[in-house]
Every structure is written in C-alpha cells, then in structure tokens.
Amino acid sequence: MNESNTIKRINVDLTPPKKAGETDDNDIDMDAGHGHCTVQCATVPKKRSVTALDSWQFSSTDLEPDMQRTYIKELHSKIVVANQPCKVIQQHIMQKLNGYKAQDVKKGFHDPEKFADMEYVIQMLEESANFCYYCKDTVRVLYENVREPKQWSLDRIYNNQGHNKGNLVIACLKCNVSRKTMYHERYAFTKQLVIVKQN
C-alpha cells in the first residue's frame, strides 16, 4: 500500500464520565480490620464569605440562569425592577474589574483610556446572554461557591494586552483558566467540537 492510501486513525475514549455520587471499585476503601468499607467523597464546595452578609438574601430561584439574565437585562436597559440583586451584581462586577485592573497594572498592560468599565461589562453580558464564548454554557453572575467553575469572567483575546474594550469575551472561569495562552478561536473550536461515533 502506498503513502496516499494510508488510513490514519484517531482513538477516542467515549466512556461517559462518572456523575456525582457514582463509584467504581477504585473509589471503595475496604477496611478489613473493622469489617466495613468507606466511599471516598468529593470535597464540599466552600461558600463565599459574601453569602454570610445581610445583603445576600437570594432564593434558589433568584440564582437560576433565567433570573440572572433578567437582572442583566434590567441593568443594561437601566430600568431596574429587582433592586437588591442588581445592586449586588454591580458590586461584584466592580470588585472583579478592580482585580483585573490590578493584574493589568502588575503586568504593565493597564491603559486607563481603553480599560473595560461597568457599563461595557453589562453590555457584554447582555449581548452574550450570559453564555460562555467558548463552551456555550451559561455563566453565573450570582454564585455561592468559591472558585465556582461557571462564574462569569472576562477573558482577554490577546494575552499581551490588558482587559481593554475590544479585547475581551465573556467566559466561564473554567474555560478562562483552561485556555491559558492558546489562540482564542482555536480554543473555542476545541470546546465546540462534536465527535460523532459511527458504527
């Protein structure tokens, strides 16, 4: 067989990942001395300190993605109906922007003229409908757990520039951290790639 007729194969493991609460033999620790077994548990997510404040009085309905989209629409249109959630969202956006500014200053990327502001971030969240640019999952603007993988973040398209208008996309924290320095369109392609299994 010549080079041009060679078939290249890619092996892909299509075994579905375990869901929370599922175990296999590797997760069970038999304690022969006491005649029982214990199942290793995943660590319990740590609650953010802000959830203990009086201002954090949200029901599970308030934290649903559809409600969070509604709050962003209210902030974007400047017709605020749900005053408390919108106020907390604005405070959190400001805190994140201050963190991004500190990162940019430290790296020498800060440009006060171009740096993203509150209005710009709200517009981006509204335009993205609170979806991650890469994985297309819903991002959370209100979240209870520390290091919540689906919390919203601003990912820089070009990592040699700051968190500037025109250089940002809305991304979940998981995708933002995973992408690192990979070209943004290439990373988006890998996140949206669908592998079809043929029989």
Where are these regions (language model features)?
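Short beta-strand-alpha-helix junction that forms the catalytic/metal-binding core
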Residues: 129, 159-178
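Short, charged surface segments at domain edges that flank catalytic/cofactor-binding sites
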Residues: 83-134, 160
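Histidine-centered nuclease catalytic patch
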Residues: 137-168
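Short, non-ligating residues that shape and space the ligands of small metal-coordination modules
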Residues: 141-142, 178-181
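Short, cysteine/histidine-rich loop/knuckle motifs that typically chelate Zn2+
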Residues: 133-136, 174
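Eukaryotic intrinsically disordered, low-complexity, charge-rich
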Residues: 46-100
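General detector of N-terminal leader/presequence modules that precede the first folded domain
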Residues: 1-70
